[in-house]
């Protein structure tokens, strides 16, 4: 397939490696009971709207949390739009059931691609997609804008910084819902183009 021509360092592209099917991997997914695969049209809209709501909140200087807070306003925050290709590649990876691991090569012909992963589970109902994105947003509480992204803080703030990375333009996500040990689990992989989270670059330009 065409993704075998996209090279990242020395690793095969996710879609080259695992094939073009968006069916869950029989090898890894048999440990859980999968109940649904992929994001609905409604969920797509919720993903884009929630990213843009939060990006605008930060851009307008309304985010009071931080270490220290508040976060400064931004002058260059793009509005994100949905990208089906990013979503497709994210879905192929989500379907491998390699939970909490990032794939090594997810770029498109157009973009270097970044990625956020989230998981939540409940006995009552599948956690909603917005609640998963909010987990990423909440990392703002540990972020120091003037310090930016460092090797030391990256594990604590890297999801937040990708969500609000000003130069990112598009997002596409894949998801699976499954039951494991009686828990209704929702696993979300979002891919971002162009990628954020470059060390030494500001996450956005201060207004």
Curated annotation (Swiss-Prot):
Subcellular compartments? Secreted
Disulfide pairs here are: 4-16, 8-105, 29-97, 173-190
Principal subcellular localisation of the protein: secreted
Q: Which GO terms describe its cellular component?
A: extracellular region
Enumerate the spans annotated as SCP domain.
48-192
Q: In which tissues is it expressed?
A: Expressed by the venom gland.
The reply to whether Secreted figures as a keyword in the UniProt entry is: yes
**Signal peptide range:** none
Q: Which domain of life is it from?
A: Eukaryota
Among the Pfam families in the record, one is CAP
User: What's in the keyword line of the UniProt record?
Assistant: Allergen, Disulfide bond, Secreted
State if Iron is listed as a keyword.
no
Identify its protein family: Belongs to the CRISP family. Venom allergen 5-like subfamily.
Q: Assembly state and interactors? A: Monomer.
Q: What is this protein called?
A: Venom allergen 5
């Amino acid at each position: 397939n065409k993704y075998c021509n996209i090279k990242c360092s020395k690793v095969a592209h996710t879609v080259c490696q695992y094939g073009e099917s968006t069916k869950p991997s029989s090898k890894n997914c048999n440990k859980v009971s999968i109940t649904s695969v992929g994001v609905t049209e409604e969920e797509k809209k919720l993903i884009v709207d929630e990213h843009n709501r939060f990006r605008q909140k930060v851009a307008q200087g309304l985010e009071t949390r931080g270490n220290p807070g508040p976060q400064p306003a931004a002058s260059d925050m793009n509005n994100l739009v949905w990208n089906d290709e990013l979503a497709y590649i994210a879905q192929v990876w989500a379907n491998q059931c390699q939970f909490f691991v990032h794939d090594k090569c997810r770029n498109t012909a157009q973009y270097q691609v970044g990625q956020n992963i989230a998981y939540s589970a409940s006995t009552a109902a599948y956690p909603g997609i917005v609640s998963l994105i909010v987990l990423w947003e909440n990392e703002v509480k540990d972020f120091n804008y003037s310090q930016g992204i460092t090797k030391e803080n990256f594990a604590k703030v890297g999801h937040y910084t990708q969500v609000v990375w000003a130069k990112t333009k598009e997002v596409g996500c894949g998801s699976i819902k499954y039951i494991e040990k009686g828990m209704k689990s929702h696993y979300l992989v979002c891919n971002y183009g162009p990628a954020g989270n470059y060390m030494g670059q500001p996450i956005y330009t201060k207004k």
